[in-house]
């Protein structure tokens, strides 16, 4: 892979028209998410640096929210937000940074620790993708790339500095970052640092969300050596540190202690309470309502998350159609530390991942191949503090290892003068997980195929079939001890984890069809019109959920004294996606719609954590060509009444209106300056996203200034 300063700089030059900042790029091509450097590769969705600067999002999930059927899960704390893709999230969506997996996952806490200032672009693959990335890719893949010096240098400069200051009113967020970079014909180097500081978040109608303040700081260093035309090496190291004081369950609105739970229980059972006769909920409704509105017991804690990654890349790209080779060696380490504010009880979870990826592509006259081998080793260690008061009932600490080896093959077979393109792929994974006392091992084959039919020069049809799997995580395999518990006058009520030796991997079989219409010079010379429609059906077997088990010797909700990770057979996720865009030299109009429904095929019951349907419309207009652009987006989120029977909460509809403006001249006296302004939730709506335990951000004015020299 020969890197040209000119070509790489051009692809990331700040596009001042900003016409595509909020629109979905339907024909993005990149090798990061698809692992495919061939000319036939296709990345369905992409967010460029220009789009990220315009949005000024504070999390990866928020940056992707305008994509149909991609939503934010995890509440309003940015550190806990994760992308929900077609109803699946958390460890069912693979996260990739600079071509290597990020495997840290801890229930109700964050796993996306890369700050937006260090992201050059984001790619999204929607739908099962295990044939590319192995275990976990049931919902899709989110792949991020950090910048290098060649991204930031302009006009064949050899040295540069970029300074950015951002501010947001909803939480007084201050974002500072500085990058210094240089390059010549052989070497390129980049050093970046950032510091973010935020107060408590303001939600709709002026209310504050307690314990949402945070600090995050860190940096990135990259070095590249273009040895010759055929050989290049890169070395990068990234470190970030995140600090906050929040409930141990980062998705919960407030701290919820055992004492508070007991108080609510006593109030409910008190015969002298003032419930109107028809207003008092049933016993089951009461307990399910507590869980759905407040979450579980969660104590206020000081939290720190050091995260680091080191990656070595080697590229071999001789003038040989059989060789286009990439080798990556990497080491990731993430530590999640918590200390309870009142009792001082300490917890720690540490995950280290070491791995190697080897990939090669071969271009033959009538067929193209991409093939490779991945190996990674995860090592997790946990510490769980206890005492006789608030930490009496705790999960047991565990240490475990996991080894995964995967081999994959992707082929592209053009037929009938490339009118048809057949792209089959397959991946075989072997994995084992072990603790001191237990060992599991298994393997899985993940096939996929894609057929693209170019009917005319303005109409394409695509049909996909993808299979995916997710092996049980080490937490699902090895967690033991108490899930939660409390002491009462009649004794201890303890909910304990029960191991499940028969826990099976989740598997997914996805069917998908897409129609893509694209016209040039439709109404006037130089305009472009695109419309894309997709229907998918993802059948997920053995979906793993934590299930509370009844005690056969007792009655009522209080008898739920065990929790066990179990497989739910025959879950079905289906939905549609529509997106359209019309673009002229100055004007861009766009709309998109996404809807996902999920149910258990056996019981017919709705699945949890399925985002509400949404439709968005917007426009961008260059008031001053190549200099100043304004835009607006209106998004309607439908009511979500499809919830599990024991969820006890439904969610009303709401509409959000966002405005934006960008000043970024390509030439002239101020060509090195870029200003972005955004006003989100213009009318300060009070709203709560489906399945979130807290309300969303209120009116938020954002401003960002970037200066390069």
UniProtKB/Swiss-Prot annotation:
Residues annotated as domain TBDR beta-barrel: 158-709
Classification via CDD domains: ligand_gated_channel (cd01347)
Record's subcellular location: Cell outer membrane
Pfam family, one: TonB_dep_Rec_b-barrel
Record's keyword terms, sorted: Cell outer membrane, Membrane, Signal, TonB box, Transmembrane, Transmembrane beta strand, Transport
PROSITE patterns: TONB_DEPENDENT_REC_2 (PS01156), TONB_DEPENDENT_REC_3 (PS52016)
Disulfide-linked positions: none
Domain TBDR plug, first and last residues per copy: 36-147
Signal peptide segment: 1-21
Stored InterPro entries: Plug_dom (IPR012910), Plug_dom_sf (IPR037066), TonB-dep_rcpt-like (IPR039426), TonB-dep_rcpt_b-brl (IPR000531), TonB_haem/Hb_rcpt (IPR011276), TonB_Hb/transfer/lactofer_rcpt (IPR010949), TonB_rcpt_b-brl_sf (IPR036942), TonB_rcpt_CS (IPR010917)
Domain of life: Bacteria
Membrane topology: Multi-pass membrane protein
Motif TonB C-terminal box location, chain numbering: 692-709
GO molecular function: heme transmembrane transporter activity; siderophore uptake transmembrane transporter activity
Cellular component aspect of the GO annotation: cell outer membrane
Role played: Required for utilization of free heme at low concentrations.
PANTHER family in alphabetical order: HEME_HEMOPEXIN UTILIZATION PROTEIN C, TONB-DEPENDENT OUTER MEMBRANE RECEPTOR
Family per record: Belongs to the TonB-dependent receptor family.
Name listed for the protein in its UniProt record: Heme/hemopexin utilization protein C
Natural source organism: Haemophilus influenzae (strain 86-028NP)
Gene name of the encoded protein: hxuC
């Amino acid at each position: 892979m020969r890197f040209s300063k000119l070509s790489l700089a051009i692809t990331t030059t700040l596009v001042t028209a900003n016409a595509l900042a909020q629109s979905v790029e339907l024909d993005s091509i990149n090798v990061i998410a698809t692992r495919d450097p061939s000319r036939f590769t296709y990345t369905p969705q992409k967010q460029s640096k220009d789009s990220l600067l315009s949005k000024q999002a504070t999390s990866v999930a928020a940056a992707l929210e305008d994509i149909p059927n991609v939503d934010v899960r995890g509440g309003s704390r940015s550190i806990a937000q994760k992308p929900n893709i077609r109803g699946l999230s958390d460890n069912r969506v693979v996260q990739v940074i600079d071509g290597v997996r990020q495997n840290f996952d801890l229930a109700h806490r964050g796993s996306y620790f890369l700050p937006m200032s260090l992201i050059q672009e984001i790619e999204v693959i929607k739908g099962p993708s295990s044939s590319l990335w192995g275990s976990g890719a049931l919902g899709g893949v989110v792949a991020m790339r950090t910048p290098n010096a060649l991204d930031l240098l302009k006009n064949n400069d050899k040295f540069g500095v970029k300074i950015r200051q951002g501010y947001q009113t909803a939480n007084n967020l201050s974002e500072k970052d500085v990058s210094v970079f240089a390059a010549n014909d052989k070497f390129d180097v980049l050093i970046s640092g950032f510091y973010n500081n935020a107060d408590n978040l303001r939600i709709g109608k002026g209310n504050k969300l307690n314990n949402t303040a945070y600090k995050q700081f860190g940096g990135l260093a990259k070095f590249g050596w273009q040895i010759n035309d055929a050989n290049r090496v890169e070395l990068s190291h990234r470190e970030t540190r995140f600090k906050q004081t929040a409930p141990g369950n980062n998705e919960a609105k407030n701290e919820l202690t055992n004492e508070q739970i007991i108080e609510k229980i006593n109030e409910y059972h008190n015969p002298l309470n003032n419930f109107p006769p028809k207003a008092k909920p049933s016993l089951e409704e009461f307990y399910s309502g507590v869980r759905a509105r407040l979450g579980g017991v969660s104590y206020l804690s000081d939290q720190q998350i050091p995260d680091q990654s080191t990656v070595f890349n080697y590229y071999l790209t001789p003038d040989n159609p059989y060789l286009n080779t990439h080798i990556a060696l990497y080491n990731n380490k993430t530590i999640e530390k918590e200390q309870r504010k009142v009792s001082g009880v300490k917890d720690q979870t540490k995950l280290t991942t070491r791995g190697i990826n080897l990939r090669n592509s071969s271009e033959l006259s009538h067929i193209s191949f991409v093939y490779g081998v991945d190996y990674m080793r995860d090592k997790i260690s946990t510490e769980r503090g206890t005492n006789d008061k608030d930490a009496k009932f705790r999960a047991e600490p565990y240490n475990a290892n996991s080894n995964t080896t995967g081999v994959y093959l992707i082929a592209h077979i053009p037929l009938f003068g490339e009118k048809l393109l057949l792209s089959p792929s397959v991946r075989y994974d072997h994995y084992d997980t072990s603790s001191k006392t237990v060992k599991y091992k298994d393997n899985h084959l993940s096939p996929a195929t894609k057929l693209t039919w170019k009917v005319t020069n303005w109409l394409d049809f695509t049909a996909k079939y993808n299979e995916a799997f997710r092996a049980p995580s080490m937490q699902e395999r090895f967690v033991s001890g108490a899930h939660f518990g409390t002491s009462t006058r009649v004794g201890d009520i303890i909910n304990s984890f029960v191991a499940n030796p028969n826990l099976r991997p989740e598997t997914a079989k996805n069917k998908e069809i897409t129609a893509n219409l694209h016209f040039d010079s439709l109404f006037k010379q130089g305009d472009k019109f695109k419309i894309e429609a997709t229907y998918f059906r993802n059948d997920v077997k053995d979906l793993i959920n934590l299930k509370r088990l009844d005690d056969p010797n007792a009655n009522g909700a209080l008898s739920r004294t065990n929790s066990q990770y179990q497989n739910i057979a025959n879950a079905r996720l289906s939905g549609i996606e529509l997106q359209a865009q019309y673009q002229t030299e100055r004007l861009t109009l766009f709309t998109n719609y996404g809807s996902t429904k999920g149910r258990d095929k056996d019981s017919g019951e709705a699945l949890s954590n399925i985002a509400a349907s949404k439709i968005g419309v917007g426009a961008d207009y260059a008031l001053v060509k190549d200099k100043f652009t304004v835009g607006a987006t209106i998004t309607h989120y439908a009511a979500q009444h499809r919830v599990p029977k024991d969820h006890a909460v439904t969610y009303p509809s709401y509409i959000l209106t966002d405005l934006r403006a960008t000043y970024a001249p390509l030439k002239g006296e101020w060509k090195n300056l870029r200003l972005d302004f955004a006003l989100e939730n213009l009318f300060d709506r009070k709203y709560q996203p489906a399945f979130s335990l807290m309300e969303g951000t209120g009116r938020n004015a954002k401003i960002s200034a970037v200066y390069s020299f």
